[in-house]
Amino acid sequence: AFSGILAEADIAAALKACEAAGTFNYKAFFAKVGLTGKSADDIKKAFFVIDQDKSGFIEEDELKLFLQVFSAGARALTDDETKAFLKAGDSDGDGAIGVDEWAALVKA
């Protein structure tokens, strides 16, 4: 899903670092997976991969399954991790993360 954007080895390392429930940190994950240093275009491409229902927003249910977009065998985020992730990215308070909010979150 992220071919041409992210390296498989980086994805594997990023997932390994947050295997245990409660250890997910979006900033650390973005850095490990190599997203932080990507172009605005690649960051947008990643958004559209994560936006599974193609609504133009990443909603809470999509955030919960965020890690599984990178690898089908990955765990779901805990409710606390999901809510913290949403709160960090949802700057306009509409309950979802739009593409511009996503870009700002990745670069934060």
UniProtKB/Swiss-Prot annotation:
Pfam families: EF-hand_7
Domain of life: Eukaryota
Binding site for Ca(2+) 1: 51, 53, 55, 57, 59, 62
Disulphide bridges, residue numbers: none
PROSITE patterns assigned to the protein according to its UniProt record, in alphabetical order: EF_HAND_1, EF_HAND_2
Residue positions binding Ca(2+) 2: 90, 92, 94, 96, 101
InterPro entries listed in its UniProt record: EF-hand-dom_pair (IPR011992), EF_Hand_1_Ca_BS (IPR018247), EF_hand_dom (IPR002048), Parvalbumin (IPR008080)
Gene Ontology molecular function, alphabetical: calcium ion binding
Boundaries of every EF-hand domain copy: 38-73, 77-108
Key words, A-Z: Acetylation, Allergen, Calcium, Metal-binding, Muscle protein, Repeat
Residues recorded as bearing N-acetylalanine in the entry: 1
Keyword set includes Cell cycle: no
The keyword Calcium is assigned to this record: yes
GO cellular component: cytoplasm
SMART domains recorded: EFh
Record-annotated membrane-spanning stretches: none
Note: Is regarded as an important allergen.
Function comment: In muscle, parvalbumin is thought to be involved in relaxation after contraction. It binds two calcium ions.
Family affiliation: Belongs to the parvalbumin family.
Name of the protein: Parvalbumin beta 2
